[in-house]
Amino acid sequence: MALRGPMKRSHLRQVSAPSVDSLSVPQSQSPEALYNDERSHQDVHATPDERTIRLSSGSLERRQCSLWVHDETFSREEILFNQAAFSDLNVNVGDVIEILPVRSPGDSIHSLKSDLGARSLRDSYLESGSAHLPDPMSKFKTPLQSRCLFVVKPLPQEIKARHPKLEISVTHSVANIFGFKNRTLVNISVVDRGQCSASHVDIAFRDQFLVRSDMWRLVMSELADKIIYKGQKIVFMGSIKATVKNIFIRGKKVLSGYFSPHTIPVFRSESAKYVLFIQMSREMWDFDSEGTGDILFSRVINGFLPELFKRWANSDAKHLVTIVLFTRVEYDSSALGGPLPLSSESLRCISSPNHAPTRDFYRVVVNDMASGHWTTILDELKKDFRTFLRDVSILKMDRPDTPTVDGVKVAPKNKPAIIAGRPSTALRGNILEAIHLASAHLAYDHIDRDLVHTGTSIIVITPGSGVFEVSYESLSSTSEALADRGIAIDLVCLSPMPLHSVPLFKYKAPVERSGSSSFGDFHSTGYSPEMRQSFSFASRTPHLSPKSTMQGSFPGMTRKEHLSARSDEWNYGIPHWLDISYWNPETYREARRIAKKDPNAPIPFTVTKQSKLFVPRVRMYEIQMMGVMESEQSDISIPYLLEGQGVSRPSNAGLGLGPSGLSSRASFRRNSSYKAQLSDSLRPEPFLQNITNPRDVMLAKAKKTPNQVIAWMDQYDEAVFQPFAKRRQQRKASRPKRPSEPEVQVSNAHERLSARSVLRLREHETNSNSGDRSYPTRTIPRVSETLSVPQGPAPSKASTSPKKPALKAPSAARTPRMSRTISFALLGFGATPPRAQASTEVNVEHARAQPTSGQKKPSVGFMDTRSVESFSGSDSASISTVIDTSLRPASPHPAPQTSAMTPTRPISIKVPPRQPSEDTEPVDRTVLPESYSTTSTAIPFTGDGRRDSRTKNGPSFELTVSGGSRESSIKSPQNKALAPWVRSINPCNTSRDVLRDTSWFGRWQHAYPRPPHVAVVKWKSLKSPAILPLTTEEFPTAQELGSDYLQTPYRVFPNDDPEGVEVPKTRGILLREMISLRLSHGFQIVIGKHVAEVSGQPALETLNVFDTRSLERDGATVFLSKGNTIHRLICVDGGEIEVTRFTHRTSSTLAAGKRDGFSLYTPAMRTILSTEYELKNIKLDPTAEDYNWNYADNYVAGHRDYLFNPAQQLQFWRVRYVLIPMPLQVNNRRHLQSFNEDNEEEIHLLGINQLTHIWQRHRYVPPEEKRFESSNEKKDQNPLNIMYQTRNPSEVVAAELDRILLSDPGLDNSPAQLLPESELLERSSISLSSLAQIIQGEKGVRMMDRRWHWRLHYNCFIGFEFTTWLLQNFRDIDSREEAVQFGNELMKHGLFQHVEKRHNFRDGNYFYQISSEYRVARPESRGSWFPQKKPDKQVPSTGASENPRDSAVNGHSRSESVETPATPSKSKNKATIMLSKMMKYDVDPRKRSNRPEVIDLHYDRLHNPDNCFHIELSWMNTTPKLIEDAVLSWAATAEKFGLKLVQVPIAEGCAISRTQPFRKPYRVSLAVPPPPGPVPTVFNTATFSQLGSSDRHYYHKALLRKFDFVLDFEARSAFPADVEVSYSWGTPDYQYPQYIHRSGSLLVQITDEGDFLFLANRLVSTRLAAATREGSRYERMDRPEHLRARASTHDPLDRISPRLSPLVRPLHDIGSPISPQGQPSIDLAQLYRAPEHILNSFEEFCNDAARLEQFYSVSHARPASTKVGPAPTTVMDSSIPTLELPASVVSHHIQSPALTTRASVDGSMPSVDAMTRARNDSLSYKGSPKSGSLRPLNIN
């Protein structure tokens, strides 16, 4: 109570956590005493509320010395300490030394006092609510905070010899942090580690993806048992970078500290993905009449969001932002034509006051946009706000998804669009559904992993005050999903803070239906909170709305409601995954002034002069409109509030709410609990007895001085917190409630109350002042009947169903009236109200205030609904305005029987006793503890779901809080299921002990160095979200673990025979890998007393999780938990690890009930480019723990034979990249040196081969195999045998189907040495003729007919295969370089020649033919990539993968292959073709990590250089940062060869909505349908023929080529139906063919109907931005300048997101040669283009009928061969013959008219000699089959 006065200034310290007075230091203790007593405290784990500040430790022996400052040239050590100069201190190596500047005594005392006093208030407020102070030392004034710590190391001898007088020296960086100057005097002393151990350390990182296992390893390697300081840079494995942002010791920020085994690291990401939800509820359009007059949305767009974005910019954060506007719209049934048979496909029928159906709307404003473009984001937000209300309010009756009255669809002319909806209140909004939607994509977080951003944060901005009415199913499902996915939510409220605990979710738990119910029909009917009852809370007044418009059952109940009834009592829960903030622009402005040290700024938490006599806290719009100051004044009484205090109302007639029934403004200043605001009967007698007239009260308040106010508050506190002796005697089975907590302060809120509420207040006032002092017994049973108010003279505790003042009853005794339904602009429908009549009932739907928890049921404390009796016999939709009286401390004085101003005792809530003996005894909390419920009751939840009917005897139970109890509690299965995530509490009187309980924050408890304050904005979380902590203390009790969990044990041991895979060698390594795997999947290591008590191992309480040696001992136990799953790892004898999985029973038993009614969610969604809202069916099932941990652990241990597709079975992290061919310019060829004769296509293939060479060099080889491999290294061959074809894979497979029934092992593996050792050749003893015979013989190199584009080359071999042959069969050739050199010698001697005589011999995909003089006649040429085999052999399942054909026949169904899993077996009648291959790749060749870092690298085996080359990476437990480094090096290499490495989604574009609900492809249709396409040419190496049907998408493909799209993946239907095509990563399941723009920013698919589906590639910007920022470290130092300027792989996007909107523009404008067609397509493809620019130009073209007709006419029928684009014609072109083979052979197969037709139609053939082939001609390339060597060769 000591700080009550200072706390009066602002409501921002009104918290649901320990208040600041519990954290401050007693002022009575002198700084000297504090400083000296510090030595006596040795407890490392100091509690936040301890009263002493420990500043130093250990010894008082101090030495004064001179401190030097040195630079790196002097020494690289941060601190040099001459141990010999401090021999008197007995300093040893390894001791911790404290450096403190010498200060004058006055300075020390002054700084200490400032810390003990104002520091705890002012600075802590500034840290959480404002920007950093200009002076960095302003926050670190005390010795504890500003001291410099270091560990003693030996001084180098050379420095000691050169500088014998050196005592201590620090670097400039350290001196700047601690404020040291050269030659300054400092005090040196030895301190104990325990006194300088940090409790929490904030570690920030950005631009990298870190899994939590990497964080664990980083701490073990770089931080554990070391001294750390603020601003310290951390580098782990030379790649992972982080910065120490804050260090906390006992809740205070310090500059340095010791990272002890018990220090908790808190990692915060500065490059996260933010999803901002803005709840566009009804209140968002309310005007702030007492403030600026703006609507609440202005607070978002002009206040909160700009401030948030500015803070992001100031901290250099690189977040991706998605903003979604959402609301729930209620429709007027009368406007729709009466009651409608609403189906799930139309509108959901949710019970509301008028039984209105509802629909949820979501409008995506921006998606994954870089936070740096915040001005653009705000502009878009403003534009969408203008039309949002219009769009969601208009109901189009002609929509097929909107039913009519008779259920049939009618024409638009009969049913035009009508305005039939209005947004619901924030209280009843769809907040949980929105959060669940945002987190849904995290279930697929392992797919398409972004390697730049870490963490996902969801911010929900609501105009409400943090109270929401939800359904049990949605709360449970959302909580479970968030708990499993390890993310938390930030809730930002625009309304003032209520007077109770927040954030608050009120729900009704399902109960079993019974045949008979004591609750009547209404109870037996039941309803879920989805069936919104007549409880229409508004969002801003902490009052109850006892509106009983519904009795009995009602129509429209779903199957779920018929199966399971709802409990009649409200439950109240605070989820640990939701962090709440309150945005107050005025308070923020004050905080900014304080931060800027404005001398006129108010001092926080001090009493200042009141600026107004009366500041209304409830806005009553209707009252303002009806002349309240005139005739209505005598009938209407406005509750008089103070600092956010709620409306006060009488609890009986004697208090009448007339002019004499108002309370003073100063009534509940500090210690008012929420329920204290609800009834004047609870106000202290000394104050209530003096109230005569509200106007007098107002004037009296104006005259009060602050001292008088404080005196009154003290008087009130003394009255409130007296022992409840008399009350306890009058209660049954109850005990006194704890006093209201001081930190729950009154909110400085402008609360709002609608006219309906005031009218009912007036009505009740009329009834209550009629002279009848007693309430008649109601004749109609009401749900809330047991909420009783003592009657007049003698309050009777056994009164049966006493009438409540605020209870609206449909009784005949009540004067009939109609409440006004139009309270402000958006409440635009309803019956026209008669003249308003006052009533004490407050309709919370319109009373816009902090909707509190206790509003609807007496169970308003977060008590278990089964524990406290509901008010049987009263309407459950109604509640007394004094319900909460039972939750409030009772008045200490007996209630006089005559005085009208005498307050009665609080109303109690009856709870039926379990046994008759318990009726007269209070319930002992220690006997019936409840860990999650604040209700202490002896009444268990009965099996039939009903309660004992003894509640009719009157309420006799009072709520208590027991959040901290560890004993098992009596809870229903429903509450047990919810308990881990949502804590049930009493919101109106939450115990301080409960709020201080660290387990209050659940899995996030270790993320808080000190208790957070509710009322302030959590800028730290909003700027850089915390990653889920590595440790937790949350653990079930022994009883719960034994009874509520299923156990599954198994054992794991390392595989002794790994067979070439990376496996842990010892049990310790295996244990670390198993823990790392669980940490990366969201598990937390459990520590603390709870797990130690349950397991019986005290060592677990202080487990050092950063010391793996202690974890690897025999018998060592580690517990890890995630949601409802607990894993126990025990090291047992024999080198094994025993794993026991504990799975909660209710998670499976209740799952069915939750999914039945809530799984299918049908909101109306409008994505970025959509023109209207469309319904989407979304399943919101919670993620079940279906991960097979037994398989995963054994896979880690090396037992992998039982898994045929581990990447999918074990949910590997997966990413996919494509290499996109880009056009090369002339100046880009300079660095290619000798390859200037290569054309563009050859250079691209050369780049792919260069990458394969890197992959081969860094492929993973187990250590045991390296010994054997080193001897054979000279004979090693590149295993990445990629086959290059100029047709698409489906065409190759179709054309070669007759020849690929058998696969050639040589294509996949290095061919065995063909010649025996004795027959190996030597270069010196071989003749050309004999060598020619051997080469063309059976043991020679493979000769076959090969086609390249339109040219056929007979009996040729490939340079890369011939190089391998020479290396394997020549004894004196030891390397591929020597083989190439020998091949050139053979070529010079005329043994063979290039098919087009353009190249010398190269190790690549170059075609060569034996010269005619050495050629051996062959009866039949091998015209396939595969050798002719005998047909009686079986086809291996891993067979030929590169066999093509032009198959444009889309005859067979797609669906049968879409869902088929990849299996190693093949169909009996189908050939199996594998089109990709996998290799183990080592991403850590420099061995920076202490473990193998291996990934699975999948690459194409069959590639068309005109298309994308596919790369897919998958890994299980590898460090992602090392993977990113490897990818960046690949990108740098590929860029040199004109290839752009781009990350793309794994799934096809049309399936994006399955994993990301806020995204949808954009459809573009052709204005003019294209004519039938040409008949495709099905050709192979022997024939050309016109077969099959025409390609109906021929013109679509041509149009995509025109706009620089290249083929990514073909549709599954494009492959022959009799061939089973698969990839090493799985079966292709693309429904439509997919193309990608050369910029990588846009994907497009062609549907069967001929439409285009466009989708922006969100992954390209993050990938390339990172490549630009980090690429300089990876092979960029040797890049020519002209390459660095290219807008290719490494050009930055400046955080531009490729989202589809006209918001992003290209950064660079680099010119390029104009294509011969005259189109700037190639120019645009060379620079990054935001996808909307490409889309706009493409859509404009498709909508132009004339241009389309012209395009169709000039596009002649010809076989399509997509090209990269034109390249300059080289000098050598004219000297290359068209074909080497004789004309007689060529003319038989190649028709010359096709050449002419193709060239003329294309229009891009330059006018050159016929022998010259331009690169841009898709028919005839100037090059021959080519691929280039593995690395640049200097060939003369």
From Swiss-Prot:
Record key words, sorted: Membrane, Vacuole
Membrane-topology descriptor: Peripheral membrane protein
GO BP term, pick one: positive regulation of autophagy
PANTHER family, per the entry: DEP DOMAIN CONTAINING PROTEIN 5 (PTHR13179), GATOR COMPLEX PROTEIN DEPDC5 (PTHR13179:SF8)
Chain positions covered by the region annotation Disordered: 1-51, 727-816, 886-975, 1421-1471, 1814-1836
Organism of derivation: Aspergillus fumigatus (strain ATCC MYA-4609 / CBS 101355 / FGSC A1100 / Af293)
Biased segments, Basic residues type: 1-12, 727-737
Name used for this protein in its record: Vacuolar membrane-associated protein iml1
